[in-house]
Amino acid sequence: MPALSRNTVLALIGATLVLHTTEEYLTVPAYLSSANRLLRLLPPPEFLQNPQRQRVALVMATVLPLAVIAWAILRPRKALLVSVLFLECILLINAGSHMFAAWVRGGYAPGVITAVMINLPFGVYVLRRAVKEQWIPSRTVWQLIGIALVLQIAAWAVSWLDKQSKMPR
């Protein structure tokens, strides 16, 4: 079986993003309406606690990266390729955060199925292939993963600090 072309791999990054955000889109409202330990520990920012706003944010978090992916396919440039691979790093780190959320919750958390079954293995495949085929150096992959991890931790910290600032003193 011939290897997938780079453009096909980039398009599949978009497809995995769509699958993942679709799972979240369909399951977040029930998740937000349920009382659970995770929401007490790391609540979403106030503006995302409304299911309608959450859905709008999920659509934007899908459409904008898809535009970058399409641009990278139609107008191949190194910066666009790195941007799409950074998106893949974000999806990979996000898979870890979904596993953490499911563990804290003691069960299902929105997005965990696609994160574990699709984004995690596909992310590893894409990044290994990017290094093997010299799309970008391994050092750059590790830097992108590090930046994605810092952004995830910062998002958690902002949510936690926002919650702390609203607690009665």
Language-model segments: residues:
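N-terminal signal-anchor transmembrane alpha helix
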Residues: A3-L26
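Core segments of transmembrane alpha-helices
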Residues: R55-A72, L91-N94, N119
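Cytosolic, membrane-interface loops and tails of multi-pass inner-membrane proteins
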Residues: V28-F47
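Membrane-interface helix caps and helix-loop-helix hairpins in membrane proteins
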Residues: R77-K78, M99-P110
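Hydrophobic alpha-helical membrane segments
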Residues: C89-H98, G111-R129
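Membrane-interfacial loop-to-transmembrane alpha-helix junctions, especially the N-terminal start
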Residues: N7-L10, A79-L87, S138-V141
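Terminal transmembrane helical module of multi-pass membrane proteins
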Residues: Y125-R169
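Aromatic-anchored segments of alpha-helical transmembrane domains
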Residues: T21, I90-S97, L149-W156
